[in-house]
Amino acid sequence: MRYALVCLIALAAATITFRVHAFECNQYKWDQLLDSQLTAENRYNDYSKEFNLVLGIFKSHIFLSKQFSHQELISFWKQNNPYFQRQLNLQIETARQAYKLLLKQAHLTQIEIEQVIELRDGWTSTAESCRSQSQEYQYMTAQSHVAHTQTLISDYASLSDKFRNLALRYLNESNSILSAKQAALGDDLDLK
């Protein structure tokens, strides 16, 4: 019994020691956090460039559901013209592919948010460690990194929303054309 108690106390002491060392106010921890922050910022810049490219494509894309009324789209399907139907089916497929890709990007940027939250929490813990060691300058610097990572979290969330909103525009395009097809041809089509 006494041996078990000694082992339990030793385990608790090791756990406490590990936790303290995990967030020490030292050069190694700072370098780790700075590397992680630089990586997160670079990935954000890459996602932003990708979004801007996609936005340019989106702005130049012709959305049939915006160019033509629902009745006009129905009339294209009713004409039973193979050329029109091929073009409409191609538009549906293109819109669905764009929807899936943009939704994937929204999901990937959401995953990045989780990683940046961990980074912010690391800076917060390091700041507290610096404060407890009376290293006021390091504490203030770490706090500025906490604020910066919080801004990065907001930027990622905004970017994720933008990807998601573009994805929904493409989904609406696909669904509008499919709805017109269903109305014209009476098919029981999947609108998802």
Where do the language-model regions lie?
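Bacterial N-terminal signal peptides
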Residues: 6-15
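Positively charged n-region of N-terminal signal peptides that target proteins for export
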Residues: 1-5
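N-terminal signal peptide c-region/cleavage motif recognized by signal peptidases
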Residues: 17-19
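C-terminal amphipathic alpha-helix
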Residues: 26, 30-33, 44-48, 115-192
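Generic preference for well-ordered secondary structure
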Residues: 6, 21, 28, 42, ...
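A structural signal for well-ordered alpha-helices, especially hydrophobic packing surfaces
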Residues: 41, 45-48, 99, 106, ...
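Immediate post-signal-peptide N-terminus of mature secreted/exported proteins
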Residues: 21-79, 186-191
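Mid-chain, structured segments of secreted extracytoplasmic proteins
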Residues: 62-108
